[in-house]
């Protein structure tokens, strides 16, 4: 008897998930494999995906258009949280996984599958994100992870697929692993595994090399409503269109590249290359607007929440009780985070050069050093005495 009768497989059309189809049937005795690909804004690469899945042995191949949900329900909350894992990575891939898990579980229920499967290896973070998310949504479903057990190198995986007529989208001489969605691209493997190796320009698609960027700066204005980006240069945009346009504009100025050594959940360090133009402007712009509209104590406390939020999303705990509790706090903080941020794009830099809001807590008459100054300087002496009183008492006690 096989490990499952009917399986819904998370499918990308790449090497690992394509090889999973014959592997599940030939090696694990699965009778029927239904593939499910999430349209997260990858672009043209999804066009032939049904045909490839069917040729690889799938009984049915599904594509779910979840672009709008991806941005509204996953990316936008992350922007409100200023989510940057290890203060650099805007979680483009990590944010997609709980959504894919959700539609996998829904498809399994619809088609009567007794298991779901994915092509994640045992060294990556995605296996955790898929397994934990699917378990949270339906703890009774079996989860199969062939790539975690088959023990094949990337070259061997490609060779296994070729035996079943599965073409590889990568060359054996340059086997980069690429994941792409509306929020950006992640590139790893191959020569990039050497951390001293400079990434070749050929791996980038969304961002221009500095030498090829415009010689004049471009200014953009991003409007936020309760922490959510809603306008670009004064024009209302739906969530997907806003991200798409920002990716194009920001990337054309060479902004949005990340080359980092990342601490994976499974305990190893990995070299990761990311392109994420829109998010690497939206998050700093949102944080800047918060500095104008949040009180100091809320702003400072939220920084710690943001770090925890980034970690639990990265670590696959999107559907956890802690995540839900943090969401409630973050949503409360966003009630007055409405306004506009002006950003200058030039030669690989995105510089915030202005911000304004009807909810601004910045008071010019109190901040100015000019003749309009209304700050009560005499009050400072009493404040300093009371503020420093514990230190004064400690110092007196310390001196005996």
Curated annotation (Swiss-Prot):
The keyword Electron transport does not apply. Its EC number is 6.3.4.5. It comes from the Bacteria. Keywords: Amino-acid biosynthesis, Arginine biosynthesis, ATP-binding, Cytoplasm, Ligase, Nucleotide-binding. SUPFAM superfamilies: Adenine nucleotide alpha hydrolases-like, Argininosuccinate synthetase, C-terminal domain. It is found in: Cytoplasm. ATP binds at residues 10-18, 38, 119. PANTHER family: ARGININOSUCCINATE SYNTHASE (PTHR11587:SF2). This is Argininosuccinate synthase. The lineage of its organism: Bacteria, Bacillati, Cyanobacteriota, Cyanophyceae, Nostocales. The gene is argG.
């Amino acid at each position: 008897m096989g490990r499952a009768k009917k399986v819904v497989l998370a499918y990308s059309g790449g090497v690992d998930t394509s090889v999973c189809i014959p592997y599940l049937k030939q090696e694990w005795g699965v009778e029927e494999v239904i593939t499910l690909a999430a349209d997260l804004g990858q672009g043209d690469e999804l066009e032939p995906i049904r045909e490839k899945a069917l040729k690889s042995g799938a009984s049915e191949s599904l594509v779910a258009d979840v672009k709008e949900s991806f941005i509204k329900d996953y990316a936008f909350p992350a922007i409100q949280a200023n989510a940057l894992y290890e203060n650099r990575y805007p979680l483009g891939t990590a944010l997609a996984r709980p959504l894919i898990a959700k539609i996998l579980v829904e498809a399994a229920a619809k088609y009567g599958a007794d298991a779901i499967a994915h092509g994640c290896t045992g060294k990556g973070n995605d296996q955790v994100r898929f397994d934990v998310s699917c378990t949270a949504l339906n703890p009774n479903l079996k989860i199969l992870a062939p790539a975690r057990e088959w023990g094949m190198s990337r070259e061997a995986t490609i060779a296994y697929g070729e035996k079943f007529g599965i073409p590889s989208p990568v060359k054996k001489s340059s086997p980069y692993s690429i994941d792409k969605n509306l929020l950006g691209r992640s590139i790893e493997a191959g020569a990039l595994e050497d951390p001293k190796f400079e990434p070749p320009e050929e791996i980038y698609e969304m961002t221009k090399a500095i030498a090829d960027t415009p010689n004049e700066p471009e200014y953009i204005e991003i409007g936020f409503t309760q922490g959510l980006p809603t306008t670009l240069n004064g024009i209302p945009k739906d969530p997907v269109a806003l991200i798409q346009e920002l990716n194009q504009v920001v990337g054309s100025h060479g902004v949005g590249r990340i080359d980092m050594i990342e601490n994976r959940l499974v305990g190893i360090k990995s070299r990761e290359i990311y392109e994420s133009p829109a998010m690497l402007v939206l998050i700093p712009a949102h944080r800047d607007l918060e500095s104008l509209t949040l009180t100091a104590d809320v702003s400072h406390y939220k920084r710690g929440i943001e770090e925890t939020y980034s970690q639990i999303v990265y670590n696959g705990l999107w559907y956890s009780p802690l995540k839900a509790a943090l969401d409630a706090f973050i949503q409360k903080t966003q009630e007055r985070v409405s306004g506009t941020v002006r950003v200058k794009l030039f030669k690989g830099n995105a510089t915030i050069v202005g911000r304004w809001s009807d909810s601004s807590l910045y008071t010019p008459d109190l901040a100015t050093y000019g003749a309009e100054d209304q700050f009560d300087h005499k009050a400072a002496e009493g404040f300093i005495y009371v503020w420093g009183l514990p230190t004064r008492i400690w110092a007196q006690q310390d001196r005996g």
